[in-house]
Amino acid sequence: MNSFQKRIEEIYLERDRARGKQGTLLWFVEEVGELVRAIRRGERNNLEEEFADVYAWLATLASLHGLDLDAIGAKKYANGCPRCRATPCECPHPKPVV
């Protein structure tokens, strides 16, 4: 487990367990909404805070489900893109709409 997820557990795990998985999920979704708002509004000064909040709530959710974010991320992406196995990804993607 990475040090960030461990630190979030030290600070919040007991409180998050008491809130439960569903309640914690709602907080996570709210934080994702705040991040989306900051990105859409171009609020550069809020991005660090909102990214950190989303990362913390994601770490908490993983912990509540008994998952190690670092391990599952490394496992899924160890061989590059999970679909084409290339690094960088060589999957055909439509051009982004601007």
Language-model region placement:
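Flexible "arm" and connector segments at domain edges
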Residues: 1-51, 55-98
